[in-house]
Amino acid sequence: MTTAAASSPRTYQVRTYGCQMNVHDSERIAGLLEQAGYLRAGAADDTPDVVVFNTCAVRENADNRLYGNLGQLRPRKDQHPEMQIAVGGCLAQKDRSEIVRRAPWVDVVFGTHNIGSLPVLLERARHNAAAEVEILESLEVFPSTLPTRRESTYAGWVSISVGCNNTCTFCIVPALRGKEKDRRPGEILSEVRSLVDEGVLEVTLLGQNVNSYGIEFGDRYAFGKLLRACGDIDGLERVRFTSPHPKDFTDDVIAAMAETPNVCPSLHMPLQSGSDDMLRAMRRSYRSERYLGIIEKVRAAMPDAAITTDIIVGFPGETEADFERTLDVVRAARFSSAFTFQYSKRPGTPAATMADQLPKAVVQERYERLIDCVEEITWAENRRLLGKTVEVLVAVGEGRKDERTGRLSGRARDGRLVHFDAGSLAGQVRPGDIVQTVVTYAAPHHLNADGEPLAHRRTRAGDAAEAGQRPRTAGVSLGLPTVGAPPPMPPAASSACSC
């Protein structure tokens, strides 16, 4: 029998669904697999040795999407029996053995608390020729200790906490991610510095509720202190965070945002509903007046701040008057963008069994009215930037039409998406570089800048992108098994082409 060590390295692919937390978890999954000797499958490889689904249980029809994708893989699995399929993330934490019952060709099911076990579970499933299902009820190892394969040379996610202590009636995340666990500030800042040392310019601090950071070690001002400490890190040009909860938003955090030059003038703060009755039913612990009061304070401290939000339409019991109150708050808040969702039942949440579930047609009609209202406001807010100079961090994959239009794309400091013409700098601007340019056109969801750029600054992140390099966070040694023997690293190329 040929041993794994003697065979060629096995390849992997990670498919991610859901929020930024899942995106960052997938970076950890990739880092774990590469540390264990796997190689990332090429884009054209439709039969990798391992396919990992990192799932979401929050989005509508998340289970149907997963089982549909698993069904599409079954013929390939039948043709290539050595192929392994693993399912992790929130849906795996929720459904557990149900996944293997409905899709018996799945090899491994792992949860949100034991990502670090994946390489061992894959090896065990291969050895035993049987599915491995391992779901833990509490965090095994804080995810920051796991190796990470970063997808960007210029921007990185850094978790400051996992889990959530809130009990929103529509949300299943606390049941799947557990109670809030906070990293200590020194660990967070060490990770941020290591990313900056590798050329990263922008860091997003991640947590289910970043404003409650510090509750585990008894410091209610910890998040403001953390933002200010990030301001002392040389080379860190942009700091963002997501998501805060309005009930925990303090004046100290607003002051820290305004006082710290590298904290971006942007804020994503979920509203969910503008109706106090709906907020009470959602168990959101704030009311619309407090929400608008926070926005007023943020804009007083940071007049150019772009504020974005999440809104749910059609929550059980929502009346036309409740919905009109949501529109009123949207008009008063003047969001620069909004993620809007039609309510759908999440099994296991209190809202799923509430009376007065709304007909689909009513929810759809309100949803369309909300979209129209939001787009009217975001378009007006974007038009205010016509003729203004913006600083753009050039990104990869932000502009779906870039190849056809000849533009490049990136994010302004306030988080707005900017498509720009490189002009005489065409071929010189790389992902991770900084460009200053003037806004010439505004749409509801983006800005265009079609004049000659005013300035271009080459960065170490751009150098790394050009060389095909990515920053990595090594984490700590977990004694993981090595599967196969990775080939030597190729020489760096000399040139090359988001509660």
Curated annotation (Swiss-Prot):
Gene that this sequence comes from: miaB
Domain Radical SAM core: 150-381
Subunit structure: Monomer.
Cofactor binding: number and manner: Binds 2 [4Fe-4S] clusters. One cluster is coordinated with 3 cysteines and an exchangeable S-adenosyl-L-methionine.
Protein name: tRNA-2-methylthio-N(6)-dimethylallyladenosine synthase
Main location: cytoplasm
Residue intervals of the MTTase N-terminal domain: 10-127
Enzyme class of the recorded protein, top EC level: transferase
Binding sites annotated in the UniProt record for [4Fe-4S] cluster 2: C164, C168, C171
Needed co-factor(s): [4Fe-4S] cluster
Species whose genome carries this gene: Salinispora tropica (strain ATCC BAA-916 / DSM 44818 / JCM 13857 / NBRC 105044 / CNB-440)
Database matches in InterPro entries: Elp3/MiaA/NifB-like_rSAM (IPR006638), Methylthiotransferase (IPR005839), Methylthiotransferase_CS (IPR020612), Methylthiotransferase_N (IPR013848), Methylthiotransferase_N_sf (IPR038135), MiaB_methiolase (IPR006463), rSAM (IPR007197), rSAM_horseshoe (IPR023404)
Domain TRAM: 383-453
Domain of life (superkingdom): Bacteria
Region of interest called Disordered, as start-end residue ranges on this chain: 449-476
Amino acids binding [4Fe-4S] cluster 1: C19, C56, C90
